[in-house]
A protein has these predicted regions:
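C-terminal "cap" of GNAT-fold acetyltransferases
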Residues: 146-160, 165-167, 173-188
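Conserved GNAT acetyl-CoA-binding A-motif
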Residues: 110-112, 124, 140-151
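A short beta-loop-alpha structural element at the N-terminal edge
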Residues: 7-21, 32-33
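Active-site rim helix/loop that mediates acceptor-substrate recognition in acyltransferases
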Residues: 39-61, 66-67
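Conserved acyl-donor/pantetheine-binding loop and adjacent beta-alpha core of acyl/acetyltransferases
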Residues: 80-112, 116
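Conserved beta-strand in the GNAT
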Residues: 63, 69-78, 113, 118
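Conserved acetyl-CoA-binding loop-helix of GNAT-fold acetyltransferases
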Residues: 125-142, 161-165
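Conserved GNAT-fold acetyl-CoA-binding loop/helix
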Residues: 27-49, 86, 94-96
Length: 188
């Protein structure tokens, strides 16, 4: 594939589909999404991304694009706002499915949390994920956050190595969707 120019920008409402795809890829378990949300889980995640007050809102996202085509996204927010953002997210899920999931808190106050990051498969291995992480981390720091956190599966040492190369360090563990995760932070 020819070297392409990558642009990182703030998301727009019209980016809801790539945000939905990024969230689904970050969750990583398509079967669980289908079992819980049905075949149209991307449509539900898109609706959540279009909301201004949800966890996965376009207002909380940065987009990687090439030739004006979105190819990846990073979603992050102030951990202190998790319950407020999750309430909107759960409301949309309930309105669609008649039930809400039970998800443990993966962040807390005092931390800007990188919730989801993903790049379309055909664009992986080109440093785009690294650009997205750096951009959302730097945005959080410029917005006044002293800590930027994320979680990474114990079974994903490549991702952990990437985060470590960007200055993130292990600060604890979390269990999320039955998976053991490292809680990592970048601290000023």
């Amino acid at each position: 594939m020819q070297q392409q120019t990558i642009n990182i920008r703030a998301a727009k409402k019209s980016d809801a589909v790539i945000i939905a795809r990024a969230v689904a890829m970050a969750i990583g378990d398509e079967n669980a999404l289908k079992n819980y949300c049905g075949e149209n889980y991307i449509t539900l995640l898109k609706q959540i991304a279009e909301s201004e007050k949800s966890q996965y809102s376009y207002l909380n996202a940065l987009i990687a694009e090439t030739n004006n085509t979105p190819i990846g996204a990073a979603i992050g927010y102030d951990g202190a706002k998790l319950h407020e953002l999750r309430a909107t997210t759960y409301s949309i899920i309930y309105d669609t499915l008649g039930r809400t999931p039970s998800i443990p808190d993966e962040t807390e106050g005092g931390e800007f949390y990188i919730d989801s990051i993903a790049v379309l498969p055909e664009y992986r291995g080109m440093g785009i994920g690294k650009q997205l992480i750096t951009a959302i981390r730097d945005k959080a720091l410029s917005d006044g956050h002293a800590r930027v956190g994320l979680i990474v599966d114990f079974d994903n040492p490549r991702a952990e190595q990437l985060y470590t190369s960007l200055g993130f360090t292990r600060v604890g563990t979390r269990t999320f969707f039955g998976h053991k995760m490292w809680h990592m932070q970048y601290i000023i």
